[in-house]
A protein has these predicted regions:
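STAS-typified acidic loop motif
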Residues: 3-46
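Surface-exposed, flexible loop/turn segments at secondary-structure boundaries
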Residues: 38, 107, 133
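Amphipathic alpha-helical interaction surfaces in cytosolic regulatory modules
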Residues: 48, 62-117
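A cross-taxonomic marker for long C-terminal extensions/tails that follow the last structured domain
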Residues: 6-9, 112-133
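Short, well-structured hydrophobic secondary-structure segments
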Residues: 37-62
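Extended interaction regions within the primary functional domain
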Residues: 12, 38, 92, 116, ...
């Protein structure tokens, strides 16, 4: 008998225009890595938003979401906010949620973009250096 709370991982391989996405409830991995400027943001991000929405209904007791972005456009930023708002619902219901925004030492653009997103959502974002860029 399968576990009704089980959720298949969502794994998206990176392309030149799309980030690598790993959403794996069982292993506790929630990562967004690379560059994000998909040609059709709605088509790209809808399954991600749906997956996180389902996860929010039965989350792990602790969730760590990692962003290791090199670049993302404004459409992607809007979807990142939407995704983080779903993780925010988990926090509001009493589970632990942590967001880590990785950046290179000198990448002020990615630091500022992370701060812009942090200002919009009610999730604290921890900024963590990856080293020199």
């Amino acid at each position: 008998m399968s576990d009704p709370l089980a959720q298949d991982p969502l794994l998206i391989k990176p392309t030149e225009d799309e980030p690598e996405i790993i959403l794996d409830k069982e292993r506790g991995i929630f990562q967004f890595t690379g560059s994000s400027m998909p040609e059709d943001p709605g088509t790209f991000f809808t399954p991600i938003c749906d997956w996180v929405g389902s996860y929010a209904q039965s989350p792990n007791s602790s969730t760590v979401v990692e962003f290791k972005m090199d670049y993302f456009n404004s459409s992607s930023a809007r979807y990142f906010v939407e995704i983080l708002e779903k993780f925010e619902e988990i926090l509001d219901r009493g589970s632990d949620v942590k967001v880590i925004w990785f950046h290179f030492d000198d990448d002020m653009v990615m630091i500022e973009r992370g701060e812009d997103i942090e200002a919009v959502v009610s999730l604290p974002i921890e900024f963590r250096k990856l080293g020199p860029g």
